[in-house]
């Protein structure tokens, strides 16, 4: 529900339309600016729960990579949880340095998923 409200607010603030369509318009614009094909992101709602949402996994990986190099990438990366933080509070990753991770967890229909970053000691 919060994600849906944020998506609509993004549309209102940036596209002048506080709706899912306004959010979609801004998302498409941003993806294009990032050099990605907006058609690879099929967004039906703002919360990500609709089975009509479709994202090409390799394009999601490209977006994560591009955001890591974006001038505001640190803000984006720091919005992800880590082990013991936020939604990552219950996650115990079997890594030598788990604090070098940032991730978003997901769970629906008995399926668990993680997406995010694992950093090396050199960045």
Where are these regions (language model features)?
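Short glycine-/small-residue-rich flexible loop motifs, especially phosphate/cofactor-binding loops
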Residues: 28, 77, 99
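A small/polar active-site loop signature that marks catalytic segments
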Residues: 1-74
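Envelope-exposed proteins and targeting segments
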Residues: 2, 39, 111-114, 123
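Active-site-proximal beta-strand/loop segments in catalytic clefts of secreted hydrolases
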Residues: 6-10, 44-46, 79-80, 105-106, ...
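Short, mixed-charge aromatic SLiMs
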Residues: 18, 82-94
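Active/binding-pocket-proximal capping segment
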Residues: 70-87
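Hydrophobic alpha-helical segments
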Residues: 34, 67-70, 83, 118-122
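Short, Gly/Ser/Thr-enriched beta-strand-loop segments that form substrate-interacting elements
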Residues: 90-121
């Amino acid at each position: 529900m919060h994600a849906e409200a944020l998506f609509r607010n993004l549309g209102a603030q940036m596209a002048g339309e506080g709706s899912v369509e306004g959010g979609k318009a801004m998302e498409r614009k941003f993806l294009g600016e990032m050099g990605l094909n907006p058609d690879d992101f099929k967004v039906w709602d703002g919360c990500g729960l609709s089975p009509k949402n479709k994202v090409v996994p390799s394009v999601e990986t490209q977006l994560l990579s591009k955001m890591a190099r974006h001038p505001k990438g640190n803000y984006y990366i720091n919005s992800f949880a880590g082990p013991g933080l936020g939604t990552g509070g219950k996650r115990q990753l079997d890594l030598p340095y788990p604090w070098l991770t940032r991730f978003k967890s997901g769970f629906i229909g008995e399926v668990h998923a993680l997406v995010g970053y694992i950093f090396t000691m050199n960045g």
